[in-house]
Amino acid sequence: MPEVKVPELAESITEGTIAEWLKNVGDSVEKGEAILELETDKVNVEVVSEEEGVLQEQLASEGDTVEVGQVIATVGEGSGNASSSKEESSDQSQSANNDEATKELAQPTESQSNNEETQSNPNNQRVNATPSARRHARENGVDLSTVSGKGNDVVRKDDVENSQKAAQSQSSQETSKKEEPKKSSGAPNKPVIREKMSRRKKTAAKKLLEVSNNTAMLTTFNEVDMTNVMELRKRKKEQFIKDHDGTKLGFMSFFTKAAVAALKKYPEVNAEIDGDDMITKQYYDIGVAVSTDDGLLVPFVRDCDKKNFAELERAIADLAVKARDKKLGLDDMVNGSFTITNGGVFGSMMSTPIINGNQAAILGMHSIITRPIAIDKDTIENRPMMYIALSYDHRIIDGKEAVGFLKTIKELIESPEDLLLES
């Protein structure tokens, strides 16, 4: 019987968590059709069936951790149910759903049984429920043993939702009986909230700690007078939009261009250590940190040295949209050479960014703040200033090169016409 395995995703990804089954047991499956969503350390990916037929078994449950190459489902011959997803299945036909759920529960796998036991009643009697019902109950803290199922006594998602609404209504009428907040063991009289970290959050925490422990990280600072680049941007803004189909000229393209020039001048900043070797990259794939609901993601703009300002702005904007819409692919997230992060969008005046992955350095941008600057010994003017930071691995980059790199960034941003001429 054809098997569905966790596919090879990227060199650094060895496992993932099943976020959601998109197909129920008994559903028809087309070749190349997604049957589940897998959460990895970097992005969520859909796992597809390589065969046409009927989903016979789910060999892991939502929330289970599965490894690359592990068999997670089987597909057999037949036409199956007409519905193509869990939500469509629940919406189209009450009787079809009940038959579908009965099929699934008639052949439970070991991992499914374990999952169901966690949602059983005090007498350890298994609750018959569809995957979407189990998931909704788990995410919202609903005890399935308290939910009554319609038709065939199978609990469906709408049964859980109705039970949840009824419980909330009852709770609002009995405010005097509110449950006390969960207490921590260290401070028994203080309220806390305890929740499980997402896979991506756990991975980020692990990797950040690894970087701190395994690199000789230092940070050097400089300041940039943003007067000229702001005036140039203001002067070119409208014409740039007309010439490039609505693409706006932002600061990030200037800093990306400056970073490419500085990386060419100081190639060790574009390097990494591999065992006893140092690998100096001859390409310029620069990561741009994007804040999302799932935390900070760093997709990479490829071949920045070959892109003009408009192409850079479009690429950066497209990656930001994909990141916030959770549509980034693994190809967007791996094999970068350098990273830029902008804490200034959140109001940060100065920070020490942490190096990303196996890279040698990261550039930090910050808020633009108008403050008095001594132009010469007799003149003080208010200028829009930005602090910039370069965190770097001292095992690869000497202090002289780090300072020189950041000074090059400063000089190019303060003379932005040079960047335009280069591109």
UniProtKB/Swiss-Prot annotation:
- Lipoyl-binding domain mapped to chain residues: 1-76
Enumerate the Gene Ontology biological process terms. L-lysine catabolic process to acetyl-CoA via saccharopine; tricarboxylic acid cycle
Compositionally biased intervals (Low complexity):
163-174
Compositionally biased residues, Polar residues: 108-131
Q: Which UniProt keywords apply?
A: Acyltransferase, Lipoyl, Transferase, Tricarboxylic acid cycle
GO terms assigned for molecular function: dihydrolipoyllysine-residue succinyltransferase activity
Q: Which reaction does it catalyse?
A: N(6)-[(R)-dihydrolipoyl]-L-lysyl-[protein] + succinyl-CoA = N(6)-[(R)-S(8)-succinyldihydrolipoyl]-L-lysyl-[protein] + CoA
* Bound cofactor: record note: Binds 1 lipoyl cofactor covalently.
CDD domains (alphabetical): lipoyl_domain
Skewed-composition ranges (Basic and acidic residues) = 153-162
* Domain Peripheral subunit-binding (PSBD) stretches: 128-164
Q: Where is this region: Disordered?
A: 74-204
Per its UniProt record, the required cofactor names are: (R)-lipoate
Catalytic center at which residues?
A: H394, D398
Q: What is its EC number?
A: 2.3.1.61
Gene3D superfamilies referenced in this protein's UniProt entry, alphabetically: 2.40.50.100, Chloramphenicol acetyltransferase-like domain, E3-binding domain
N6-lipoyllysine is found on: K42
In the UniProt record, does the keyword Iron occur? no
Q: In which pathway does it act?
A: Amino-acid degradation; L-lysine degradation via saccharopine pathway; glutaryl-CoA from L-lysine: step 6/6
Listed GO CC annotations: cytosol; oxoglutarate dehydrogenase complex
Q: How does it assemble?
A: Forms a 24-polypeptide structural core with octahedral symmetry. Part of the 2-oxoglutarate dehydrogenase (OGDH) complex composed of E1 (2-oxoglutarate dehydrogenase), E2 (dihydrolipoamide succinyltransferase) and E3 (dihydrolipoamide dehydrogenase); the complex contains multiple copies of the three enzymatic components (E1, E2 and E3).
Concerning its family, UniProt says:
Belongs to the 2-oxoacid dehydrogenase family.
Function comment: E2 component of the 2-oxoglutarate dehydrogenase (OGDH) complex which catalyzes the second step in the conversion of 2-oxoglutarate to succinyl-CoA and CO(2).
> PANTHER family annotated for this entry?
DIHYDROLIPOYLLYSINE-RESIDUE SUCCINYLTRANSFERASE COMPONENT OF 2-OXOGLUTARATE DEHYDROGENASE COMPLEX, MITOCHONDRIAL (PTHR43416:SF5), DIHYDROLIPOYLLYSINE-RESIDUE SUCCINYLTRANSFERASE COMPONENT OF 2-OXOGLUTARATE DEHYDROGENASE COMPLEX, MITOCHONDRIAL-RELATED (PTHR43416)
Q: What is this protein called?
A: Dihydrolipoyllysine-residue succinyltransferase component of 2-oxoglutarate dehydrogenase complex
- From what organism does this protein derive? Staphylococcus haemolyticus (strain JCSC1435)
